[in-house]
């Protein structure tokens, strides 16, 4: 009996000691895990699901709904505005309707758009290389012809293009005016006669002695 009691007591002691050694490790693991989960719940509002001891962090770390560049993560806010809002924004963002610091002119209305289109530069009636389109204006419209610059008649090295002579209506008058301005003024010369008759008399007097010598 004593031997049986001794063996049973020894077995009980071994089992009890083993249980005592295993319980602290389990309690320690459980306490650390509970503390870790508690800290995670305090840091993040939503529950965190992790596996293999790897934490999956949230995309938005702050409780605010504002993200970078003014974007919002609120699902109630529509991502794209409606078509009416887009039209209004486009009309406001037009460069002719915007004032300084983003203000809009209340006196500006939509009827001024046609006036702006009319004030835009009309297509030029001048073609390339100084040519002008013949069908762009009527031949009787003299004012419009004067408004359009005449094509260049002078070529390189002072040469003129004869094909452009039809456009220069006053070519002869300009040439006569240039010749008249280039002639030296005879009124400023005191030793020479100023009239044509006096020049003829001088020439006849100079020729008369030569004729007498020949006779």
From Swiss-Prot:
Prosequence residues removed at maturation: 23-56, 160-215
Compartment(s): Secreted
Tryptophan amide: residues bearing it: 129
Annotated stretches, region: Disordered: 173-215
Single GO biological process annotation from the record: regulation of multicellular organism growth
Disulfide bonds: none
Residues making up the signal peptide according to the UniProt record: 1-22
PTM-bearing positions, type Phenylalanine amide: 69, 101, 157
Example GO molecular function: neuropeptide hormone activity
Chief location of this protein within or outside the cell: secreted
An example Gene Ontology CC term for this record: extracellular region
Keywords from the UniProt entry: Amidation, Cleavage on pair of basic residues, Neuropeptide, Secreted, Signal
Family assignment from sequence similarity: Belongs to the NPY family.
Function: Plays a role in controlling food intake and regulating body size.
The name this protein goes by in its record: Short neuropeptide F
Lineage per the UniProt record: Eukaryota, Metazoa, Ecdysozoa, Arthropoda, Hexapoda
Gene: sNPF
């Amino acid at each position: 009996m004593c031997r049986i009691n001794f063996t049973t007591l020894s077995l009980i002691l071994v089992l009890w000691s083993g249980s005592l050694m295993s319980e602290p490790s389990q309690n320690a693991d459980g306490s650390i895990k509970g503390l870790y989960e508690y800290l995670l719940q305090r840091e993040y509002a939503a529950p965190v699901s992790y596996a293999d001891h790897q934490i999956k962090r949230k995309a938005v770390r702050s409780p605010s709904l504002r993200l970078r560049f003014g974007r919002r993560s609120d699902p109630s806010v529509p991502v794209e505005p409606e078509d009416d809002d887009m039209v209004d924004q486009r009309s406001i963002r037009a460069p002719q309707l915007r004032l300084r610091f983003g203000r809009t002119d209340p006196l500006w209305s939509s009827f001024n758009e046609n006036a702006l289109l009319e004030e835009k530069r009309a297509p030029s009636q001048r073609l390339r290389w100084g040519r002008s389109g013949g069908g762009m204006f009527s031949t009787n419209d003299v004012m419009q012809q004067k408004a359009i610059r005449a094509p260049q008649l002078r070529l390189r090295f002072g040469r003129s293009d004869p094909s452009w002579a039809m456009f220069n209506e006053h070519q002869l008058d300009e040439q006569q005016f240039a010749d008249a301005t280039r002639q030296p003024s005879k009124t400023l010369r005191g030793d020479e006669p100023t009239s044509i008759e006096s020049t003829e008399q001088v020439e006849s007097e100079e020729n008369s002695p030569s004729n007498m010598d020949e006779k």
